[in-house]
């Protein structure tokens, strides 16, 4: 059996989901490959789409595009969207790639390849099993115009939303978002995790005592990070520590270094692969409400505060988590810091949030996705 996971270069979340699934598959001896779908056309196209996505998330542009897409999507009848039409353009190249490498199963973690696979099923008789994994806690615009075999969604309480948007109920499977189980379903003891972080980060004045506040702005570095850090520095105790992960946003990193150069309670980090250990070391996590990072946090079972979302999908994520008691969501930085301090000081309040996280998280989501695939796998297709 050979599985192709199709992602897209729009933020790190989709790729993280794909990598987590690949790790779980390889652990079980399954031949699996991840492909940036648009890179099949050209690396330049993939880069341009990634840059366009990054630009669109600034200000209110993404919110407008998302709402407009939702309006168009909800008013479609028999005609297909421009999104479908655009992804049909490279579908033949994708078909040739699938045929050349003899893949038996397709898993899409992004809408674009799901649209392309739909076109191949309709126009080129692609007849191998196909799966879609939703990496946010809501149904995205245009998903209902795709035609894959199964749609794996983050939570059972979202079934009605996806069905109401037009997805066949029998195809909806509420397993959860795949995460790296080995990293996030286990925890290092806090002192050991802090020791590792202190040893890893050079030129830092990290103190192993006190409360550690972990501020994460996503792989691209979003959110009102400057205001949050300023408020934390004003309100926390002298023995407490702030660790801020700026992702790949170098301008944010340099700006914070300039603004807070004399603040020894603050440690600034760029892009890192040590998120799991940072969560082990922290007492509270502040993060924008991306679907992947939020899922990793509740599987890790750490107090979680959702900060400024990218308008659109992340608003839905934040409200879903807040409604289920898995996080606290507010865009007011004073309130964010006040809640963070309460989570550190109020044992009952903290335990209630952690209990809600355990009740709603699936640490075995990657393996459960694989089990679903294996249960529904026919004999390999002969091209």
Residue ranges and their predicted role:
Residues 149-211, 217-219, 248-249:
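A nucleotide-sugar donor-handling region in carbohydrate enzymes
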Residues 20-100:
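Conserved N-terminal ligand/cofactor-binding loop architecture of enzyme catalytic domains
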Residues 323-325, 331-349:
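C-terminal "capping" alpha-helix adjacent to the active site of nucleotide-linked donor transferases
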Residues 349-363:
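A short, well-ordered alpha-helix in the C-terminal region of glycosyltransferases
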Residues 12, 17, 71-167, 171-175, ...:
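Active-site and donor-binding regions of nucleotide-sugar-utilizing enzymes
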Residues 280-290:
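Acidic donor-binding loop of glycosyltransferase active sites
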Residues 204-281:
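Donor-nucleotide binding loops and adjacent catalytic segments primarily
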Residues 362-383:
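C-terminal alpha-helical cap of glycosyltransferases
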């Amino acid at each position: 059996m050979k599985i192709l996971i199709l992602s897209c270069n729009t933020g790190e979340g989709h790729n993280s989901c794909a990598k987590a699934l690949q790790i779980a598959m390889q652990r079980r001896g399954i031949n699996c490959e991840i492909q940036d779908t648009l890179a099949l056309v050209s690396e330049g196209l993939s880069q341009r789409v990634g840059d366009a996505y990054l630009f669109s998330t600034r200000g209110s542009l993404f919110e407008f595009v998302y709402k407009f897409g939702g309006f168009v999507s909800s008013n479609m009848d028999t005609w297909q969207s421009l999104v479908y039409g655009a992804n049909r353009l490279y579908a033949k190249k994708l078909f040739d790639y699938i045929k050349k490498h003899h893949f038996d199963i397709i898993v899409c973690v992004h809408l674009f390849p799901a649209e392309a696979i739909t076109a191949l099923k309709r126009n080129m008789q692609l007849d191998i099993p196909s799966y879609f994994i939703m990496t946010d806690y809501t149904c995205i615009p245009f998903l209902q115009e795709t035609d894959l075999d199964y749609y794996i969604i983050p939570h059972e309480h979202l079934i009605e939303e996806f069905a109401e948007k037009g997805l066949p109920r029998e195809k909806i499977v509420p397993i959860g978002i795949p995460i790296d189980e080995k990293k996030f379903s286990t925890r290092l003891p806090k002192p050991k995790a802090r020791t590792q972080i202190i040893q890893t980060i050079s030129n830092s004045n990290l103190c192993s005592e006190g409360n550690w506040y972990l501020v994460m702005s996503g792989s691209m570095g979003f959110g009102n990070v400057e205001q949050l850090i300023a408020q934390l520095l004003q309100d926390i105790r002298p023995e407490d520590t702030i660790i801020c992960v700026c992702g790949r946003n170098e301008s944010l990193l340099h700006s914070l270094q300039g603004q807070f150069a004399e603040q020894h309670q603050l440690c600034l980090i760029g892009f890192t692969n040590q998120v799991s250990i940072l969560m082990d070391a922290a007492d509270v996590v502040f993060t924008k409400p991306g679907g992947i990072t939020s899922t990793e946090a509740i599987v890790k079972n750490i107090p979680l505060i959702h900060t400024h979302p990218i308008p659109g999908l992340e608003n839905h994520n934040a409200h879903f988590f807040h409604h289920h008691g898995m996080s606290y969501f507010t865009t007011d930085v004073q309130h964010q810091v006040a809640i963070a301090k309460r989570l550190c000081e109020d044992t009952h309040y903290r335990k209630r949030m952690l209990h809600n996280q355990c009740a709603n998280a699936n640490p075995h989501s990657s393996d459960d996705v694989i089990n679903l695939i294996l249960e529904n796998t026919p004999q390999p297709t002969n091209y």
